[in-house]
A protein has these predicted regions:
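Short beta-strand/loop segment at the start of cytosolic alpha/beta domains
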Residues: 1-7
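Active-site beta->alpha loop and helix N-cap motifs at the rims of alpha/beta catalytic domains
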Residues: 3, 14-133, 143-148
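Short boundary motifs at domain starts and secondary-structure transition points
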Residues: 7-13
């Protein structure tokens, strides 16, 4: 599996890198959380802008992200607007979503930018190119909160993300049975073995899928989300447990 090197953090090499989500509503609460996270044993912080009370104000977003970048010190910053269609807090029109992505790139504060595979649609390759021109790595994401598609479909979707130029394809799916968790893990291993052009980020959500968040080094998922107090998705495991298990399962 290849590696994405961002400011010395080698994503896709060795231990999965740990992401902490910020899902606060106000700028003050976001910055307070960022200051706390800057001291914790994690590699990256995700700002979920769809939770931000000022998500409709470009000026408020730009002001907050600039302060956030300073508060996080050396932590990587992943910026995400999770649309309502993909399990997020707010809905955006297609033009609004594209404008948000371009705003984040213009701030020159993000290390990684989440771009939703289905929301971006035909604009995805151009958006990836714009991000790369701005020196920002792309996490191309797809979320299914209802089911786990078959392995072949999961692999096909991640390969399409690779073909569009994404640095880190990301899939999150909901299991309905144990076999669904195995489908997700198997698709992850297949990507690592047969399509190693990029690292991938995968997870099976909910309590049933929690094991997938802890076994990334074994199966080939390069990053995992941990719960530092407030989860941003079902099944997130606490930071202390994540770090302990990742250390115990290190290859």
């Amino acid at each position: 599996m290849s590696c994405v090197n961002i400011r010395g953090c080698r994503i896709g090499e060795g231990r999965p890198k740990v992401i902490l989500p910020i899902v606060e509503r106000t700028e003050a609460a976001i910055l307070e959380k960022a200051a706390q996270f800057s001291t914790l044993s994690a590699d990256c912080v995700e700002w979920r802008v769809d939770w931000f009370e000022g998500f409709q104000s470009p000026a408020a977003i730009a002001r907050c992200i600039q302060k956030l970048r300073v508060a996080l010190r050396d932590k990587l910053l992943l910026v995400t607007f999770r649309t309502k269609a993909e399990g997020g807090e707010q809905a955006l029109s297609h033009p609004e979503y594209l404008a948000f992505l371009r705003l984040i790139l213009d701030t020159d504060c993000a290390d990684l930018l989440d771009i939703e595979f289905f929301t971006a649609g035909a604009d995805l390759p151009a958006l990836v190119e714009q991000a790369h021109s701005a020196g920002v790595a792309v996490v191309c994401s797809s979320h299914d909160f209802a089911k786990t598609p078959p392995r072949a479909e999961l692999v096909c979707r991640m390969v399409q993300m690779q073909q569009a130029g994404a640095d880190l394809p990301k899939l999150a799916v909901m299991p309905q049975c144990r076999a669904d968790v195995l489908e997700l893990l198997s698709s992850t291993a297949e990507m690592a073995d047969l399509h190693p052009e990029t690292p991938v980020i995968t997870m099976s959500m909910g309590a049933l899928g929690a094991v997938s968040r802890l076994a990334g080094e074994t199966f080939g998922s390069a990053m995992t989300f941990a719960n530092p107090g407030q989860a941003s998705a079902p099944g997130q495991v606490s930071l202390d447990v994540v770090n302990a298990v990742l250390d115990a399962l290190k290859l």
